């Protein structure tokens, strides 16, 4: 197990030595984090993908990315293991220190193990059912489970997979979307217990921060049953953990097609005024990481044929727009092929848009 966690001193040192443009780092919770992160969602659970992903992670870190995101169910635990190998190799090679990089993962979805050739349900019964970790009714129709025994088991597995004794950020993974049968009040009751669990894990230095990784709940209108209020969640965190609570980050989809976080006024600023999710995140100092920046490649052709963008590559244009959006900490880009990694990381060589440049482009796109 690699000891330690991301620190203000370590992340600042990483930024000062990075090949990336100096404006491509942002301060949050006293940490200096790159405004591009590595995502590890896509890919088969096989050795070829392991090797591609490991090489991509190492190349990304060496070129100035110190945010790495995964989830225990990504590639059936193999993405976590690949990150662990990449990080440990870079540390052994003397190229980074543990305190320079920020690693996030997610727990909540039930997954098998890509390294064990066993039927999915047989694995679940053997690993969780027979051991009493999950019981009948715990797992939703979406294969999501948010009971404390399950989350405790998953945290320990994530630590082992990553080879890290402390995970910088642990997300509860798509809990609203993964528990469609649960009422709002019932969900908040469960979330209260989970936040207590996370605060305990912080005290034991198993995690530094916690957050919610989401798909729809922060992007839908407030009249929808799966809507969540950010201020309500923050108040819950304060009630459980006090002013120094660990709920400091959210992940949600945001790109040139999924623009709700920036456009839709669905959060309350006060009793009279509604603001967007990203405005609410700025107000509460919540770090927002964004997923699906390229819509798994579907946006690239549209960008390529849109003369309103610069002459950068389509992926750089997409990443530049997202990371320059006020309130966004960093988009998480999943890449494995060396050519894609090199192309995407060109964005690190240029500064993000100024706020004026961003709004000028936004007006062109929406005009």
Tell me the role of every PLM-derived stretch.
Residues 134-138, 145, 159, 171, ...:
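Catalytic cores of glycan-processing enzymes that make or break glycosidic bonds
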Residues 1-126, 165, 182-185, 189, ...:
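N-terminal binding-site loop/beta-alpha segment at the start of enzyme catalytic domains
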